[in-house]
Amino acid sequence: MQIRMDKENRELKAHGSYEFPVNISYEQLSRYERGSFSWHWHPEIELTFVLSGQIGYQVNGKSYVLKEGDGIFCNTNALHSGHMIDGMDCVYISTTFAPRFLYGFSNSMIQTRYVEPVLTDMQLASIVFSPEIDWQNQVLACMHRIYDLSLSQPSAFEMEIQELLLSIWIEIYRHASFSGESQNT
């Protein structure tokens, strides 16, 4: 298996639907050709939570080694890839969602004040989450809960997933170091 992309490496997979623009998936590196997924990008935000093993993860030229319990935020339009380390498999949860799921409608205060500053900051292509740091551990717990909800699908699970994504976004916004260097400048 490999990610389907266009000529510019944009992933062609739909991440959810218009009505619920969220895709939550259980992934395993060994399912990909040569234990890696190719460089690609998409306009959606991606959150990855490592369940077991390790993954070599690259985002816009930065390389990370994520181990069991770690996670990463990959910003919209960021070029990213992942691979096995020393031939060992990695199992992870990928939550990919459209930014509008956070803010609702264009030009809302939530979009302009809290979402766009993160999305457009060139230095915020990625943020690694470690269980050793309190606020990041809270983010990781939210990521795991999102996956659990996607499996059990109790009444109103979609709203609970939205609530959890907003909780994650609040933590990212509060703790991000903004460079002021926008993609739009």
Which residues make up each language-model segment?
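A hydrophobic/aromatic-rich effector-binding and dimerization subdomain
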Residues: 2-23, 79, 83-147
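Hydrophobic aliphatic residues
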Residues: 26-28, 119, 172
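Short acidic, gly/pro-rich beta-turn/loop elements at beta-sheet edges
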Residues: 34, 57, 104-105, 180
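Generic protein-terminus/edge-of-domain signal
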Residues: 1-67, 71, 77-78, 112, ...
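Short histidine-centered beta-strand/loop micro-motifs
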Residues: 34-41, 83-85, 105-107, 157
